[in-house]
Amino acid sequence: MEAVRPDSCERGTAAARAEERPAPEARAHFRVTRFIMEAGVKLGMQSIPIATACTIYHKFFCEINLDAYDLYLVAMSSLYLAGKVEEQHLRTRDIINVSHRYFNPGSEPLELDSRFWELRDSIVQCELLMLRVLRFQVSFQHPHKYLLHYLISLKNWLNRYSWQRTPISVTAWALLRDSYHGGLCLRFQAQHLAVAVLYLALQVYGVEVPAEGEAEKPWWQVFSDDLTKPIIDNIVSDLIQIYTMDTEIP
């Protein structure tokens, strides 16, 4: 087991943005986190447990070499562990069956044979390994509660017509969800991520916050005092890179 700390795991890094095309590691993690999200939905997981599963996965590979373990086994164990952390417990059998159908569409559930039990044991053993590698630090502060608060405040600032005619809320939640395809959850503070996805949603629809020009400081700094425009720009840049990968990866 080789411990590493990839540059992409450092807070606010510009390493990934320096490349015109995403690194192979980023593309691999994009595919696997897409699997985590789709499997999580099929398992009936709520948004916070899915976010926790993605964060556990990303954090594990901030400590471990990419080639050391099977990525999808780590993903399945991340789902299993996240269910425990967020008290939405999952059965290993359900995780295995959903994963099997993901890779083999239309197939029947696996028989309870030696192959099944070997995979189940691998998931459990991998979970224990992940807990040790992460030093049992598997509880995270997610941006979701901040985004909810910010959306309520923004709704009160904007006029009713602007709010109703543009899907700002839906877009901001979608941007936040998609941010977990990359390691933004580890590189940036939860409050900063929440403000940045809201900022981008407003930019997408050309919506301006009332009295912005007369205010002493930008609306986004009202939500987070230590947030700066360069941080927002970095988050937006990383989000754009994620959507670029989405168009390139089948």
UniProtKB/Swiss-Prot annotation:
Region: Disordered, residue numbers: 1-22
Sorted UniProt keywords: Acetylation, Cyclin
GO cellular component entries: cyclin-dependent protein kinase holoenzyme complex; nucleus
Molecular function (Gene Ontology), one example: cyclin-dependent protein serine/threonine kinase regulator activity
Modified-residue entries (N-acetylmethionine), positions: M1
Source domain of life: Eukaryota
Keyword hit for Disulfide bond: no
Disulfide bond entries: none
Claim: Acetylation is one of the keywords in the record: yes
Residue spans of biased composition, Basic and acidic residues class: 1-10
BP terms from Gene Ontology: positive regulation of MAPK cascade; regulation of cell cycle G2/M phase transition; regulation of transcription by RNA polymerase II
Main function: Activating cyclin for the cyclin-associated kinase CDK10.
Oligomer status and interactors: Associates with CDK10 to promote its kinase activity.
Protein family: Belongs to the cyclin family. Cyclin-like FAM58 subfamily.
Record protein name field: Cyclin-Q
Lineage: Eukaryota, Metazoa, Chordata, Craniata, Vertebrata
Gene of this entry: Ccnq
